[in-house]
Amino acid sequence: MKLIAGLGNPGKKYERTRHNVGFMVVDELSFRHQTPWKKSKFNGMVSEINVGGEKMILVKPLTFMNASGECIRPLMDYYNIQVEDVLIVYDDLDLPVGKIRLRQKGSAGGHNGMKSIIQHIKTQEFNRIRVGVSRPLKGEVINYVLGDFPKAEQPDIIAAIQKSADAIEDFAQVPFVEVMNKYN
């Protein structure tokens, strides 16, 4: 069993923002597998998919980005999921729009959602997919990540969401290092 968490902020006003690209990836998986989202007792929306016999718990924390770990750790405990079976999908300002990078460990890199998860699961050694959203050319980062993708970037971000979902489906069947080799 795997736990796949897409990071974002709950609420309609954040739905299509750069900061919610993690939600978009797990939404794509739920859509592909035609599985509903249900509110869990761990302050998140949960959907269960099955890929080649491997159960995957998809989660969208409802804690807002900066407290994502408050949802992830209790779900790991409840489902008895080991850290090597956890994968976090989140936005990355340091990658161009549409690029993805897979890693098995690393720091939070200034991402508050990742800081919260590292704090709550007490390790930096877990799988992650970073989805590029680029940096603003000028202006504040906060307004930028809470803004929607412009029309010109839509094809690139849609491709990145689909590629990320493909990588997650592969993770159901092969070790993450093989998935990294294929998609990086």
Swiss-Prot record:
**Catalytic site positions:** H19
Q: Which UniProt keywords apply?
A: Cytoplasm, Hydrolase, RNA-binding, tRNA-binding
Site positions for Discriminates between blocked and unblocked aminoacyl-tRNA: N9
Leading EC class: hydrolase
Q: Name any GO cellular component annotation.
A: cytoplasm
UniProt site positions, description: Stabilizes the basic form of H active site to accept a proton: D91
Q: In which residues is tRNA bound? A: Y14, F64, N66, N112
Q: Which family does it belong to?
A: Belongs to the PTH family.
Assembly, in brief, is: Monomer.
The family database entries (PANTHER family) matched by this protein are listed as: PEPTIDYL-TRNA HYDROLASE
Question: Under which name does UniProt file this protein?
Answer: Peptidyl-tRNA hydrolase
Species the sequence originates in: Listeria welshimeri serovar 6b (strain ATCC 35897 / DSM 20650 / CCUG 15529 / CIP 8149 / NCTC 11857 / SLCC 5334 / V8)
